[in-house]
């Protein structure tokens, strides 16, 4: 595989379709003079389970945050279900300035769920209240309807008995499962996981990975930034290795994790040989 092939969008899909759910072309993100993303091209197909690997500072988390516009891309095109989200409007003083329709971004974020490293639960709300919040304030659902849906999502992640518990009374793994339930309640078309186990004690990692695995088995479309290489091998249908803000190599788990073609990918994988592929 050449570097050009390594950086091109993969044609293999989970659903066997050529219609992208999300399409990314030339995505860049700059913080001042520092380029974090330097031209990402990516097609996300329905049912894709994409694991994103790379060293710290490579741009993995920034990519996810640009995909749901928590960070505004500096350049490039992002499409969701064939509709462009990015609105380029070069300004006279700053030709790289980009403007966005805030109402449109709010609608987009409802369709792209995100689960963070640090849970981000409201401490003054119960687990049930945290899951209900988006349904009430964003979706405008009535309390009874939101409560029913929130309880169902908590049950899905194995926390039906913790509905009335406050975050301070939950373990890290339980907090992360509440965060996953909160994302699922909004019926996202794509789920983004930003190192969801990195803040957990080792003994709590498994309970979160089991939930993510079950979502993958349901056919959920997801992107997962993770250092759990063995988990990525068994759950993902595609693996991206990002280095210095570009997709350095991509392919199936066997291609990238067992038979990488790029020296940098190979060095990264060799550091994780203790994992059972």
Q: Model-flagged regions — what are they?
A:
Residues 165-168, 186, 218:
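Conserved signature/switch motifs of ABC ATPase nucleotide-binding domains
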Residues 250-251:
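ABC ATPase "signature
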Residues 125-133:
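Short coil-to-helix segment of the ABC ATPase nucleotide-binding domain corresponding to the Q-loop/switch region
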Residues 76-93:
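Conserved ABC transporter NBD signature motif
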Residues 191-194:
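Catalytic Walker B motif of ABC-type/P-loop ATPase nucleotide-binding domains
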Residues 68:
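Helix-to-loop junction immediately C-terminal to a conserved catalytic motif
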């Amino acid at each position: 595989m050449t570097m050009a092939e390594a950086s091109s969008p993969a044609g293999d899909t989970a659903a066997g379709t050529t219609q992208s759910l999300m399409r990314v072309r030339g995505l860049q993100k700059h913080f001042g003079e520092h380029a974090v993303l330097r031209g990402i091209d990516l097609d996300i197909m329905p049912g894709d389970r994409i694991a994103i690997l790379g060293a710290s500072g490579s741009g993995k988390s920034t990519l996810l945050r640009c995909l749901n516009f928590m960070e505004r891309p500096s350049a490039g095109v992002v499409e969701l279900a064939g509709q462009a989200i990015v609105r380029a409007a070069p300004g006279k003083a700053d030709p790289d300035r980009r403007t966005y329709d805030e109402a449109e971004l709010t609608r987009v974020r409802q369709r792209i769920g995100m689960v963070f490293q640090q849970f981000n639960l409201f401490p003054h709300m119960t687990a049930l209240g945290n899951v209900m919040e988006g349904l009430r304030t964003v979706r405008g659902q009535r309390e009874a309807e939101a409560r029913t849906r929130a309880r169902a999502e908590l049950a899905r992640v194995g926390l039906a008995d913790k509905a009335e518990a406050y975050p301070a009374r939950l373990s890290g793994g339980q907090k992360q499962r509440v965060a996953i339930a909160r994302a699922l309640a909004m019926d996202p078309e794509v789920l983004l996981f930003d190192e969801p186990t990195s803040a957990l004690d080792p003994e709590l990692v498994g309970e979160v990975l089991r939930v993510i695995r079950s979502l993958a088995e349901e056919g959920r479309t997801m992107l997962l930034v993770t250092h759990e290489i063995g988990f990525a091998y068994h759950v993902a249908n595609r693996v991206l290795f990002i280095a210095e803000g570009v997709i350095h190599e991509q392919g199936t788990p066997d291609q990238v994790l067992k038979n990488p073609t790029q020296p940098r990918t190979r060095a990264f994988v060799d550091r994780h040989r203790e994992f059972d592929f």
